[in-house]
Amino acid sequence: MDFGDDFAAKEDVDPAAEFLAREQSALGDLEAEITGGSASAPPAASTDEGLGELLGGTASEGDLLSAGGTGGLESSTGSFEVIGGESNEPVGISGPPPSREEPEKIRKWREEQKQRLEEKDIEEERKKEELRQQSKKELDDWLRQIGESISKTKLASRNAEKQAATLENGTIEPGTEWERIAKLCDFNPKVNKAGKDVSRMRSIYLHLKQNPIQVQKST
């Protein structure tokens, strides 16, 4: 009984070889479009050759692509062609952008600002010098006043000491006792808030100086 075992065996088709053939054909069409049809795509490799190279490993990947046509990606000299006007060559690094010239207004403003700062520094130094001179003058005046006050105090102390020595050693004339005592007193009406009020005592001394008490000698 015949079950159809003698039917013709169908040709085996390798999917990898068929895919490579389609890709090579597409690359050839792309090259034809780019070059304007001046060069036709090279014939695609047969399915058996592609299958043999893929399975046998007799050709490298570069040989397989060159045998089947690279579609314009690689020329006969081994260099890649430019596609779409774009180059793969490295672009040189450009230098720094040229410096723009500073506008006239900004340059003028900088010069005026610099001049103002210089004038301000000069004025500040002048004021400092005036303050130093004024402080020195005030200090000299204060020292001079202190020196004069000390000299007057010393002179008054020496005079008072001489008068006290004269009163102790000299003879006292009648009626001049209170006058001599009044000379030892300070009748300047200065009020010392921290001290005692001696205004009444001063008034008594002045009264006795002007109207001394007459001392009657006993017989």
UniProtKB/Swiss-Prot annotation:
<dbReference type="GO" id="GO:0005198">
    <property type="term" value="F:structural molecule activity"/>
</dbReference>
<keyword id="KW-0472">Membrane</keyword>
<keyword id="KW-0968">Cytoplasmic vesicle</keyword>
<dbReference type="GO" id="GO:0072583">
    <property type="term" value="P:clathrin-dependent endocytosis"/>
</dbReference>
<feature type="region of interest" description="Disordered">
    <location>
        <begin position="32"/>
        <end position="136"/>
    </location>
</feature>
<dbReference type="GO" id="GO:0030130">
    <property type="term" value="C:clathrin coat of trans-Golgi network vesicle"/>
</dbReference>
<keyword id="KW-0168">Coated pit</keyword>
<dbReference type="GO" id="GO:0030132">
    <property type="term" value="C:clathrin coat of coated pit"/>
</dbReference>
<dbReference type="GO" id="GO:0030136">
    <property type="term" value="C:clathrin-coated vesicle"/>
</dbReference>
<dbReference type="Pfam" id="PF01086">
    <property type="entry name" value="Clathrin_lg_ch"/>
</dbReference>
<dbReference type="GO" id="GO:0030672">
    <property type="term" value="C:synaptic vesicle membrane"/>
</dbReference>
<comment type="subunit">
    <text>Clathrin coats are formed from molecules containing 3 heavy chains and 3 light chains.</text>
</comment>
<dbReference type="GO" id="GO:0030125">
    <property type="term" value="C:clathrin vesicle coat"/>
</dbReference>
<keyword id="KW-0106">Calcium</keyword>
<dbReference type="GO" id="GO:0005938">
    <property type="term" value="C:cell cortex"/>
</dbReference>
<comment type="similarity">
    <text>Belongs to the clathrin light chain family.</text>
</comment>
<dbReference type="GO" id="GO:0072686">
    <property type="term" value="C:mitotic spindle"/>
</dbReference>
<dbReference type="GO" id="GO:0006886">
    <property type="term" value="P:intracellular protein transport"/>
</dbReference>
<dbReference type="GO" id="GO:0005886">
    <property type="term" value="C:plasma membrane"/>
</dbReference>
<comment type="function">
    <text>Clathrin is the major protein of the polyhedral coat of coated pits and vesicles.</text>
</comment>
<dbReference type="GO" id="GO:0032050">
    <property type="term" value="F:clathrin heavy chain binding"/>
</dbReference>
<dbReference type="GO" id="GO:0071439">
    <property type="term" value="C:clathrin complex"/>
</dbReference>
<feature type="compositionally biased region" description="Basic and acidic residues">
    <location>
        <begin position="99"/>
        <end position="136"/>
    </location>
</feature>
<dbReference type="GO" id="GO:0005737">
    <property type="term" value="C:cytoplasm"/>
</dbReference>
<protein>
    <recommendedName>
        <fullName>Clathrin light chain</fullName>
    </recommendedName>
</protein>
<feature type="region of interest" description="Involved in binding clathrin heavy chain">
    <location>
        <begin position="96"/>
        <end position="158"/>
    </location>
</feature>
<dbReference type="InterPro" id="IPR000996">
    <property type="entry name" value="Clathrin_L-chain"/>
</dbReference>
